[in-house]
């Protein structure tokens, strides 16, 4: 029920270890209309955890500003801020990560093999 497939851009703070990778991504999560009636994309920043062996292929894919497709499950984390508020963030526990690129002919993102 909480499975998700997400196309997103990797942010700068990629942390790779032998058995886990974690990083932030920005994903287009909708559109909104501006005062001048133009439509803009709405971006959401999401923490991603890849709890599998980090091999050379994953290291090559997880470069800042790369476009990736994530297959995984939505979860959440909570922490206490300095003002003692409890904050809940959405995170994705990734099962599969693949590089994507924009195909001009079909106007969609496609997986790079």
What are these regions (language model features)?
Residues 1-113:
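Single-stranded nucleic acid-binding surfaces, predominantly the OB-fold ssDNA-binding core
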């Amino acid at each position: 029920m909480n499975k998700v497939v997400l196309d997103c851009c990797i942010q700068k703070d990629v942390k790779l270890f032998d058995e886990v990778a974690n990083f932030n991504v920005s994903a287009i999560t909708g559109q909104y209309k501006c005062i001048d009636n133009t439509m803009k994309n709405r971006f959401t920043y999401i923490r991603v955890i890849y709890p599998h062996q980090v091999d050379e292929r994953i290291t090559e894919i997880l470069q800042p500003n790369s476009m990736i497709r994530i297959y995984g499950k939505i979860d959440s984390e909570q922490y206490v801020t300095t003002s003692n508020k409890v904050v809940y963030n959405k995170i994705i526990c990734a099962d599969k990560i693949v590089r994507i690129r924009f195909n001009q002919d079909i106007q969609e993102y496609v997986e790079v093999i």
